[in-house]
Structure formats: C-alpha cells, structure tokens
Amino acid sequence: MSVKARILVLYYSMYGHIETMARAVAEGASKVDGAEVVVKRVPETMPPQLFEKAGGKTQTAPVATPQELADYDAIIFGTPTRFGNMSGQMRTFLDQTGGLWASGALYGKLASVFSSTGTGGGQEQTITSTWTTLAHHGMVIVPIGYAAQELFDVSQVRGGTPYGATTIAGGDGSRQPSQEELSIARYQGEYVAGLAVKLNG
C-alpha cells in the first residue's frame, strides 16, 4: 500500500476571509486520491481582549507548531496582506522555523500561497514576498498559472492571480469570498495535492 501524500493548509485569518478560502483549498486538495489533507492555523499574537475588540472571528481549526511542518509533503499557506507582506502572525510563526532551516527539513517540499486583501492592492506582492521565505527553506514553489478559467472572467470584481488564489474583502471587510474566488482556491488545492501525490510516487 502506498503512503499518502500529506498536505497541510496553514493559514492566518482575523475576520474569516482566509479561513473560508482555506476550507476551499482543503476541499480541492481532498479530491485527489492519495492525499491526506490537514487544515491548521498559526497562533494569534494579539491579546484576546484586543482581538475581540477588533472584531476578530473565533476559529475552530487546531493551532500548528513550527516543528510539525517537516511532517508534510506540501504546505499551502494562506495569509491576509499587511502592506504588501504576510500578516504579522504568519511572520512570527515562520520566524520560528530557524531550526527547520538549519536541518534542511523543508528542502524539496512543495509550497503554495493564497491571500486576501481589502481593496485588491498587494495581492500578488503578498504572495511573492511570502515566496522569499519559502525559497530560503529550499521549498519548491508552486504558482497556479491560468489553468483556472475563472481567472479570465473580467465581468465582476474578484480576486485571483496566476501566483495563487486571492479574495477581495472590501475596505471594511464586508465582502465575503465569491464563488469564483472559492473555485480558484479549490483548484489551487487540487493542483498542489496532485503534484504532491505524483512526487510521493
């Protein structure tokens, strides 16, 4: 019996947009035979009172530890943008992976990124700036290209890039991920999981 490829969807979400996208990514990845999919979030760094006051959404996904990243064949990271970069919470989490870097524990593992922005600014920059950290770990970065047909739809406001799935939350966070954005997220999960299964052989 062949060993299943282990896929981790690892995200940070304050208001729930990236959480919703993460579920869609995991749904797509779960379609692939031979893939075992896990969804986890990085720890919140804001004090609970401030998180609640800011309108943060309580989430049920278990919290990941940096050390466990080595247990997966592919990791799909989800983060909202913060001035064209990953969120501080994701940055803090990845800054704790020095031991994994020193041992080469993530070398050759697949990595892909999806994101959320308020008005669309910084979508691609957030993904590509996150790639920098993953490249230092020797991870194999997987963009999604234009295979998802929704990327060609210009009839409505939507996220989605050849670098990875994205959603536009609106300046006040009131816009939820659209069906088109979720479809692109599912494609990203399915695509990365399919590659991981092939490489797992």
Swiss-Prot record:
Coiled-coil residues: none
Positions bound to NAD(+): 15
Protein name per Swiss-Prot or TrEMBL: NAD(P)H dehydrogenase (quinone)
Recorded catalytic activity of this chain's protein: a quinone + NADH + H(+) = a quinol + NAD(+); a quinone + NADPH + H(+) = a quinol + NADP(+)
Entry note: cofactor: Binds 1 FMN per monomer.
Disulfide bonds: none
Binding positions (substrate): 101
UniProt cross-references to HAMAP family, sorted A to Z: NQOR (MF_01017)
Matching SUPFAM superfamilies: Flavoproteins
Keyword list, A-Z: Flavoprotein, FMN, NAD, NADP, Nucleotide-binding, Oxidoreductase
PANTHER family xrefs: FLAVODOXIN-RELATED PROTEIN WRBA-RELATED (PTHR30546), FLAVOPROTEIN-LIKE PROTEIN YCP4-RELATED (PTHR30546:SF23)
Needed cofactors: FMN
Organism: Shigella sonnei (strain Ss046)
Keyword Nucleotide-binding applies: yes
Domain Flavodoxin-like: residue ranges: 7-192
UniProt EC number: 1.6.5.2
